[in-house]
Amino acid sequence: PLGKFGAGFGLIPYTSVGYKLQSFNSDQILQYRYRGEGGLNKVFLGAGYQLSKNLRVGVDASYNFGNIINTNIAFGYNEQGGRLQYQSREINRSDLGGLSYNIGVIYNKLLKPNLEFTASATYSPAAEIKSKNERNFSAIIIDLNTDKEIPVNSIDLDLNAMGLSTTDLKLPSKTSFGFGFGA
């Protein structure tokens, strides 16, 4: 029913963050614990049109969204090597969102009954993704049985005063070309 038009939509993961690292000193005593989670997803809507028998063009628009949370814990010890009651934790959270676009063209021609030539090009203009940022510092107790972090005292850093509450991530423009021969 669409004739020479085509359309598509979808939701796909774009990036993913997931790590848990620990750092020890020369005596193999835990000093730092690092954790990251989250990622960027994209929901997209695309459309294409067949200009001629061998030539098609298309465009898609994407909304990129998600969040990334990075947590760092610094462990303190007394002179006898015992872990202090309170540890320091920093949590950085970035909530992300922004639009991006792609345009493309594809040409194909049947050279022989079992040989087709295909060439394509795409262009993605530069785009910006807004990041709304938060930073929190806490004194925490870590339950030795469950490893659960229990905040005792927390403070949110005023990133607005530093001009960092909202920042921009820049996606560079991208041009790609390709061609191939196949059956």
List the predicted regions and their residue ranges:
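Outer-membrane beta-barrel porins/channels
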Residues: 2-183
